[in-house]
Design a protein with these regions (language model features):
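Beta-rich catalytic cores
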Residues: 26
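Surface-exposed loop/turn motifs in large extracellular/passenger domains
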Residues: 1-21, 29-49, 54-200
Length: 200
């Protein structure tokens, strides 16, 4: 499903979505454009290999009371310099189960996320994609504002060179960031010399 027009809102509520697309290298499963809002509530969504849930720059995503199997949930924007950088305004996952193969947050060069909220949810990295650079937070050379994880289970056994919870590879921005993890079970690992939680 593709609605790549800016400033829109897509709501998926009380639905069961299972894609039967052939396996490809594309990463579009459900997509909305820049400055758009994507809301998934009380739904079950299963997307095949490399199919993801995406928003454009300066968008937001909310997942509530849902069960998702997807390649990732992210803003996918790559900039050539910090001057052109894009930001995911807010990502909320509440009372949901997510099996992911890639980023939860911002994906791409200089891409950042302002706020991530994960409450009463389970997020696991799919065993098929343990080679991926999976991060909850900002993208390559990007940053994050705040990450709040409460009453949840997070399992990311390998994040490649990325930080599992925080920013992606090689943070560029110098900014104040906050991570709060409360009443949760977190199992994460980073394959490089950087931290598993925080800023690489």
């Amino acid at each position: 499903w593709d609605a790549d027009s800016p400033g829109g809102k897509l709501t998926i509520r009380n639905c069961r979505v299972e894609s039967t697309d052939e396996l490809t290298g594309r990463t579009d499963g459900i997509r909305v454009g820049s400055n758009s809002e994507l809301v998934i509530e009380n739904s079950e969504i299963k997307l095949p290999h490399f199919r993801s849930i995406r928003v454009g720059g300066n968008g937001s995503i909310a997942v509530r009371d849902s069960d998702l199997r997807t390649y990732g949930i992210f803003m996918d924007e790559t900039a050539q310099s910090p001057n052109d950088a894009k930001t995911l305004k807010r990502l909320e996952i509440t009372n949901s189960t997510v099996l992911t193969g890639d980023i939860i947050g911002a994906r791409g060069g200089y891409s950042s996320v302002e706020e991530v909220v994960i409450h009463d949810s389970s997020i696991r990295l799919n065993d098929e994609y343990t080679y991926n650079y999976c991060t909850i937070g900002g993208g390559t050379n990007g940053s994050f504002g705040s990450i709040d994880i409460q009453n949840s289970q997070i399992h990311i056994p390998s994040s490649g060179g990325n930080t599992a919870i925080g920013n992606g590879w090689q943070v560029y921005y110098n900014r104040e960031s906050r991570i709060r993890i409360a009443n949760s079970e977190v199992s994460v690992r980073c394959a490089s010399l950087g931290p598993a939680i925080g800023a690489a």
